[in-house]
Regions:
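Conserved catalytic/binding loops enriched for acidic/polar residues
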Residues: 120
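Conserved beta-strand -> loop -> alpha-helix junction used to position metal-binding or nucleic-acid-contacting
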Residues: 76-89
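Generic recognition of well-ordered alpha-helical segments
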Residues: 88, 103, 123, 127-130
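Acidic two-metal-ion nuclease catalytic site recognized across multiple nuclease folds
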Residues: 125-162
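Extended aliphatic helical segments
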Residues: 1, 32-33, 53-55, 65, ...
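Conserved non-catalytic scaffold segment of RNase H-like nuclease domains
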Residues: 1-79, 94-97, 101-111, 115
């Protein structure tokens, strides 16, 4: 699993750091004041992701963030394919809760700094790898098929010609 992480300034109008969000992820406006913005970093993100299927826990939310950030900046969001590790965990493990730390623990990934984006991404990857091994799937498409899940695709809107 390749790893990459970076901070970026949120798009204007989406750059308020609410106290309850900061309590969750620990980031403040001061942390990103010198970071490049979404438009400047989107090429690096797309180069890193390539044509891979993206994975996130409650992936629909994360994909909407990618789409909305692109819309807010006038950038074109790639129509990434994605699979949700929460859905995979629900069909793989018998847990009282499928929150990321518990699902990751079921996959053998313990004691990570939850809500650290890079650590959360690695936890999702570990869930997918463990689930694929348990179900005898050789890739994410086979895993989705085995579990009767659909690989989603980010719904993108055409850029307006202004």
């Amino acid at each position: 699993v390749e790893r990459a992480g970076w901070l970026m300034q949120p798009p204007p109008g989406h750059d308020e750091f609410l106290e309850w969000n900061t309590r969750i992820h620990g980031l403040t406006a001061r942390d990103v004041v010198r970071a490049p913005g979404w438009s400047a970093q989107l090429p690096a993100l797309t180069a890193f992701a390539g044509d891979d299927v993206l994975v996130a826990h409650n992936a629909g939310f994360d994909m909407s963030v990618l789409r909305r950030a692109s819309e807010a900046t006038g950038d074109e969001c790639p129509p990434y394919a994605y699979l949700c590790s929460l859905q995979v965990a629900r069909k793989t493990y018998d847990l009282e809760s499928y929150r990321l730390p518990l699902a990751a623990a079921a996959a053998g990934f313990l004691d990570f700094p939850h809500h650290d984006a890079l650590a959360d991404a690695e936890a999702c990857a570990r869930i997918m790898i463990d689930a694929a091994e348990r179900h005898g799937a050789h890739d994410l498409a086979a895993l989705a098929d085995t579990l009767s899940l659909r690989i989603g695709r980010i719904a993108v809107t055409e850029k307006a010609n202004v």
